Amino acid sequence: MVLSLLSVMLLSGYKFLSKKEELVTILPLPQVENKFKPQKIWSYYIGSNNGGGDFYSNLQPTVQNTRVFVANRYGLVKALDADSGKELWAKDLSIYTGCFSRNRPAQLSGGVTAVGNRIYVASELAKVYAMEAKCGSLAWEVLVAGETLSPPVVSDGVILIHTSNGMLQALNEADGALKWTVNLEAKMLNIRGGSTPTTACGTAIVGSDNGLVSAVMLNIGQIIWQQRISQTGGVTEIARINDVQATPVVVNGYVYALAYNGNLAALDLFSGKLMWSREIGSFTNMLVENGIIYLVDQNDRVIAVDAKNGITSWYQSALLHRNLTSPVLNKDSIVIGDSGGYLHWINIDDGRLVAQKKIASALLVTPLFDGDKIIVQATNGEVHAIIR
């Protein structure tokens, strides 16, 4: 199948402006002899993530204790029993427009975050909602600086919100009151999304769409350091995009960051000093486990890299341009979804494909693990639990 690179990105929920489209070939599904037989144990339908419009929201579920929290773009937020998929409660955040009119979609986006007794979700309409995890009642809602396409992050009593117009804001966890705002300088042309911040040692580490990684003090919102890991280049609009979309990962005093059309880089957590970099570009999140970085590059090549020096351990090219999700760890494999609705299991030692299973329609958000279960949310609104 041949599609434009622009079309492939639109399937991911990202929007580009480009005068010239680059054609890519999507590889056919590889034939895999399954080493084990993944099985669905339950399914649930929450509703499509397009909210009745032309845009798709990458809404990732989350799990806490024995509950899975899911949402769709229209505004439905639900708690499901993790073992059975049974609905425990539902909350409708769609916008009331009058007795004789249909509610407007809340345009929820990014994903659900569960911390303590509350869950949090943000929207493209620049709203952040806090709900009680036990029953779904609304604790508070606030307006922020812009549309929010990444999930809220909760740390040290604050909720971090990274808006698509380049603002990093900290809200009080108790009532949503604004504590501080930092401008990370958004560009006019960028991938429609936003790097999810990560936190460590009292700082927020976040990427931005100008190729920078920034460290910001959580208590006062002061930038401690910034490091550029990607330069603007190329002759087309897409070639000049250098967003740091992937969530930075902090391990053993190192910050691992990844830019589209840029580099995989290891930075010193406390100074931002560049320790090493590799020419690998991506906008999906990476996984760091036992000294190895597992990632999907922007051509959907799956790569394992030594975290100490950036040297490639192995790569898997059988899934090129299948619009892969970020990888997650499942025992001795990493698991990745694709736009054809398949889950793929890849051996962590050598990159061999060891199993695959058709789950649903397109899988564009990262799979979620709960014990021995994999939870996935498909673009058509189906939520599935799978075991190996």
UniProtKB/Swiss-Prot annotation:
Compartments reported by the entry: Cell outer membrane
One of the record's GO cellular component terms: cell outer membrane
Span of the signal peptide: 1-17
Stored SMART domains: PQQ
Keywords, alphabetical: Cell outer membrane, Membrane, Signal
Domain of life: Bacteria
InterPro entries: BamB, PQQ_b-propeller_rpt, PQQ_rpt_dom, Quinoprotein_ADH-like_sf, WD40/YVTN_repeat-like_dom_sf
Entry's transmembrane regions: none
Key word Iron present: no
A GO biological-process term: Gram-negative-bacterium-type cell outer membrane assembly
Subunit text: Part of the Bam complex, which is composed of the outer membrane protein BamA, and four lipoproteins BamB, BamC, BamD and BamE.
Function: Part of the outer membrane protein assembly complex, which is involved in assembly and insertion of beta-barrel proteins into the outer membrane.
Family recorded in the similarity comment: Belongs to the BamB family.
HAMAP family: OM_assembly_BamB (MF_00923)
Name of the protein described by the UniProt record: Outer membrane protein assembly factor BamB
Source species of the chain: Moranella endobia (strain PCIT)
